[in-house]
Structure formats: structure tokens, C-alpha cells
Amino acid sequence: MITIFTMAYNEEVMLQFMIDHYRSRFPNCQIIIRDNQSTDRTVEIALSNNCEVLPYDTGGQIDDFKLRDLKNNCWKESKTDWVLVCDVDELLDINEEQLKNEAANFTIIKTQGYDMINMEDNFDLSSIKYGSKDNNYSKSVLFNKQYIKEINYYCGAHNCTPSGTVLYSDNIYNLYHYKFINQDYLINRFKLTAQRLSEANKKSGMGAYNSDPEEKTRKVFQDRRSVATKVL
């Protein structure tokens, strides 16, 4: 019923959790990993879970313009009508039965974004139950390509201007964003990302927060904890 497309670079920490999340809701879903030349266990984990891995090359750099184009086109040859286009840390809380019900009347699933945060200093992703609403992550990640001819994501895919028969669901489904899973992990991810930013990203300012001082990132993490409420 559904094909899931996700973009990955060195996602060995999140990938198994993401796969388990979607396979528990859509047991027969196909998951396609568009891998940006990962150097960790990302590809190994993907293949061991019967995911298809398709590499894409950006010359060792993060280029949000190329990533936008990939998200706008990677799903068009899918054999299923319903496609889900997301990053590895974006988990949509909808199951097969719910989607079948929505498919009778709607072509895009409406979402409410939540920034999830680990209240403990560990890597136990399954124990992360707290978060806060973030409309920036209320993304249009799940849609029916039989009716949506172009999704037209902007960079980051936070917004889009779809064309075709555009019918958003009345029901709203939570989209959990697992960015704040561990302070040290986040800081190291930011440092790695800052080193890989393309000239196009630097000129546009996209991803500039990855260069923030470590102290600022730790404060943001603690601030998120202070306002988090139980979500799951």
C-alpha cells in the first residue's frame, strides 16, 4: 500500500528505530534508502532489514537544493499509490488501517509536528516520550501520487505547493522529529554537518545553525527539556 523514501547520511543511530516504527505500522511497506555515501553502518543496517539502498552523490557535501530536487522526484516511479517522503529522524504516527480509511476521501495526510527530546542522558530511543509542538515539522510527507502530480517541496520540505487533486485529510496525525536524542550526539552531528555544508548552503544560510558554539547547542537542548510535555 505504501512506499517509504528516506534520505540518509551516517544514520546508524536512528535507522533501525525508524525502520521498526514504519514496519510495525505497515508490515509490507517497501523502504527505499537514498544514501548520501554514508561511512558508518547505515547501508549495512538497511540491507539487513530488506530495504533497498540507492546512493546519491553530492561530492561529499550537503546540498539542500539537490536534496529538495531529490525529494520532489524520487517517488514518481513508485509502484504504490501512497508514498511517504521523510528524513530518517521523522516518524509519522499512522497505520495501515487508518491510511486505508483516509484514502477513500483524501490525497494528502495532514500532520502536526513534534520535536521529541530525550529527558535522560542516554541513547534509549524507545524511552523518549516527551516533546513539544513544532509547526515547522507539520510536513506533508504522506500523499497519493495517483492524484498528486507534483509535491513541490521547498528546501527542507517544511512547506510545499502540491499540484493535482489536493485534498488534505480532516484528521491530523502526529509527526515525531527525533533530533534531540542526546546532547553529545547532537553536537557531534552539528560539527560534522558544518564541515560538509556546500557553498550553495553557505550562501543561502541554510544549515548555519550547525556552526553554533557548543555552549549554545547545550543551552537549546536544556531549554527544550524545560518546556517538554509527555507526548507518547
Model regions and ranges:
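The conserved acidic donor/metal-binding loop of glycosyltransferases
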Residues: 87-91
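A conserved acidic beta->alpha catalytic loop
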Residues: 34-45, 58-60
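Active-site-proximal specificity loops/subdomain of glycosyltransferases
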Residues: 46-85
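Catalytic-site signature of metal-activated, phosphate-bearing donor transferases
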Residues: 64-69, 94-232
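Short, acidic, metal-binding catalytic loop of nucleotide-sugar glycosyltransferases
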Residues: 20-29
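N-proximal low-complexity "stem/linker" segments adjacent to membrane-targeting elements
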Residues: 1-20
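Short beta-strand/loop segment that forms part of the nucleotide-sugar
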Residues: 6, 28-37
